[in-house]
Amino acid sequence: MGKKVAIIGAGVSGLASIRSCLEEGLEPTCFEKSNDIGGLWKFSDHAEEGRASIYKSVFSNSSKEMMCFPDFPFPDDFPNFMHNSKIQEYIIAFAKEKNLLKYIQFKTFVSSVNKRPDFATTGQWDVTTERDGKKESAVFDAVMVCSGHHVYPNLPKESFPGLNHFKGKCFHSRDYKEPGVFNGKRVLVVGLGNSGCDIATELSRTAEQVMISSRSGSWVMSRVWDNGYPWDMLLVTRFGTFLKNNLPTAISDWLYVKQMNARFKHENYGLMPLNGVLRKEPVFNDELPASILCGIVSVKPNVKEFTETSAIFEDGTIFEGIDCVIFATGYSFAYPFLDESIIKSRNNEIILFKGVFPPLLEKSTIAVIGFVQSLGAAIPTVDLQSRWAAQVIKGTCTLPSMEDMMNDINEKMEKKRKWFGKSETIQTDYIVYMDELSSFIGAKPNIPWLFLTDPKLAMEVYFGPCSPYQFRLVGPGQWPGARNAILTQWDRSLKPMQTRVVGRLQKPCFFFHWLKLFAIPILLIAVFLVLT
């Protein structure tokens, strides 16, 4: 009989964890607070306490070929960037296809997870749950925490003097659902993240006036990239990652800023980040630049002070007659069912080895799935995290010593601060991270070997999109359809758009894409070498 594993949450992280446990012969029991799977992607017309909440118009920022489970592509006719209802439809189909629903206890709230008295030798946990007012406790050999990090809103009211005197409505973006109730209103959105920009542009169609207040600015990217292809299929590549991590810093930074300004010059729109070379996750919004051009959205600096009816910005300008302030100020990390000694934090950083395992426990029998954030998609990331975690729980994989894990955490955190900034503690380099995890379980593709044995596939794997299928090519959980999925991914990305075919479809040429991007720096390097 396999080890018993408690899984908290039935979103994409929880479903991936159930499947990974089954692949390793473990016995999963998943506890889900609501009455359905999907987590973040399950829309509700009201925000529920202790559960992620989205607005009705949410679309994905990752394209379908880059955000699927590695052995379960999205249907061919699904659009590249999907409405939340389409993603929920896909999640349900995945759960049914993999026969996962029978392992989930719905409407069950996990109230506490505690070490058993003999934890130092057994690694076991007491898990207490509540359902219909009744409490139950059970012993589990391991726990996988899949409750997400978009649950507890960060609403820093103390950072805004005078907010307590403001007479209009004031709430966090998690409580925003649709724009109709803001017809003719004057709205201030605080925060220039994905939610803030989405809400501001959506409200601009019905509200009288909309302003966005940003403390530090942000890069704003379009989902549509060169020649109309999805951005991530062109930018999230192994070759691109190699260049980014090996070019001289000055050239890498210059290229990054040039890439971010390819669509429009951010400085002219008041969007330029304070430190533009930091690789903080950009905002994905196709409407914001046009909304600013048309004057229906204005960008302002940080709010210095609120009055009863207005906001005074740091540049001295005033937005008067405000009806509503929406704080799109992100979320805080919290695991209320766990003792603080289990998952420690410091300086807004949760201390986890590779973003998954608490390093200071006697036994590595608790894992956090879905806590990292990157330019890559969540679903393939949590799939790989859960596969690794399941192997560690089973005993197939072993972790380094506590000292080695802490040294790795400290080293990585220094690199993160340099690359992403001090506040972006859960950001990571997607391909580097995925290769690291896949190497632990023997699922990392061997690129040199591929070039020798299957050059056609190797070219697509190295120069093409780093799609999820790459991490089911070899090793445990290998998917026989992975090779074909990689070679046909461009066809699937084009199919939903070909409702009026006007010519022969052509795949992008990776060589010319990168040559165009690096033409100037290559020329500069050549001149430098000649002169020296």
UniProtKB/Swiss-Prot annotation:
FAD binds at residues 9-13, 32, 40-41, 61-62. GO terms for cellular component: endoplasmic reticulum membrane. Keywords: Endoplasmic reticulum, FAD, Flavoprotein, Membrane, Microsome, Monooxygenase, NADP, Oxidoreductase, Phosphoprotein, Transmembrane, Transmembrane helix. It is found in: Microsome membrane; Endoplasmic reticulum membrane. One of its GO terms (biological process) is taurine biosynthetic process. One of its GO terms (molecular function) is NADP binding. Its cofactor is FAD. The modification Phosphoserine is found at residue 401. It is a single-pass membrane protein. Its EC number is 1.14.13.148, 1.14.13.32, 1.14.13.8. The keyword Membrane applies. The chain crosses the membrane at residues 510-530. Its main location: membrane. It catalyses: trimethylamine + NADPH + O2 = trimethylamine N-oxide + NADP(+) + H2O; N,N-dimethylaniline + NADPH + O2 + H(+) = N,N-dimethylaniline N-oxide + NADP(+) + H2O; hypotaurine + NADPH + O2 + H(+) = taurine + NADP(+) + H2O; (S)-nicotine + NADPH + O2 = trans-(S)-nicotine N(1')-oxide + NADP(+) + H2O. The keyword 4Fe-4S does not apply. Pfam families: FMO-like (PF00743). NADP(+) binds at residues 60-61, 195-198. Belongs to the FMO family. Essential hepatic enzyme that catalyzes the oxygenation of a wide variety of nitrogen- and sulfur-containing compounds including drugs as well as dietary compounds. Plays an important role in the metabolism of trimethylamine (TMA), via the production of trimethylamine N-oxide (TMAO) metabolite. TMA is generated by the action of gut microbiota using dietary precursors such as choline, choline containing compounds, betaine or L-carnitine. By regulating TMAO concentration, FMO3 directly impacts both platelet responsiveness and rate of thrombus formation. This is Flavin-containing monooxygenase 3. It comes from Pan troglodytes (Chimpanzee).
